[in-house]
Swiss-Prot record:
The keyword Transport does not apply. Its EC number is 2.5.1.145. It is a multi-pass membrane protein. This is Phosphatidylglycerol--prolipoprotein diacylglyceryl transferase. PROSITE patterns: LGT (PS01311). NCBIfam families: lgt. The gene is lgt. A 1,2-diacyl-sn-glycero-3-phospho-(1'-sn-glycerol) binds at residue 155. Keywords: Cell inner membrane, Cell membrane, Membrane, Transferase, Transmembrane, Transmembrane helix. One of its GO terms (biological process) is lipoprotein biosynthetic process. Catalyzes the transfer of the diacylglyceryl group from phosphatidylglycerol to the sulfhydryl group of the N-terminal cysteine of a prolipoprotein, the first step in the formation of mature lipoproteins. It comes from Helicobacter pylori (strain P12). GO terms for molecular function: phosphatidylglycerol-prolipoprotein diacylglyceryl transferase activity. Pathway: Protein modification; lipoprotein biosynthesis (diacylglyceryl transfer).
Amino acid sequence: MNAWNTIYDQFNPIAFSLGSIEVHWYGLAYACAIVVAFYMALRMIQKDPKRFPIERKEFESYFLWAELGIVLGARVGYILIYEPNSSYYLTHFWQIFNPFDSHGNFVGIRGMSYHGGLVGFLIASYLYSRKDLKKLLIYLDLIAISLPLGYVFGRIGNFLNQELVGRIVPKDSHLGQIIGIMVDHQLRYPSQLIEAFLEGVIVFLMVMWAKKHTKTHGLLIVVYGLGYSLMRFIAEFYREPDSQMGVYFLNLSMGQILSLFMVIVSLGILLYATKNSKKIKENQ
């Protein structure tokens, strides 16, 4: 047993308190994720204006729409997919975003679905671009290249919040014994950090490679979608399935099943981008 194995005994998920309001590391990490994604996108606009012909004010307005879509989609997606008492929230819709418990204590909003956030993001992007759909793929590409590094902070936040824990490390796994984290007296994979690396860093490198070697609008979001789906599918083998969900056919988790659907959506965007690529190039 090394110091890393027992790191959860060394810190509190609560960063600090403001009166009765407890500020968690996850909240701070999520705020960092938004800031990183925002400024990464601005840097891309300034560095490559031909690929991203968008004014800063225009992007700022779009970013608000996208972030709102992500938050709404992530929360509603969690309720519909993962929440055992989803029927209660569907009849008490206002409770979905209620950050207070029944005693009036601030507890924050727990339970967000990445894939739900993706759906919300796509819907928000379409609604914002519906008057000028020629820019839709440009917006999507911009988010595709700015989101992965922000995503890293989100998964680090999950790690600091001691949630979305990994599967139990087999006793014969030498590497697992080194990197594992003790959770409830069981050594588990640090799946949140594995996801941060695979779904954040590796996917970012994939999208940057695509940016260098492609010229068609819409391909960056396709590479992001396919790359994330693959990395998430792999990472799920180290992540403990949600207790209320378990596994399904072929022992696949819900995250893996949703990632397969994400592949289908990505291929659909690829068809749309291919069909409209000539028009987009002419309008540059």
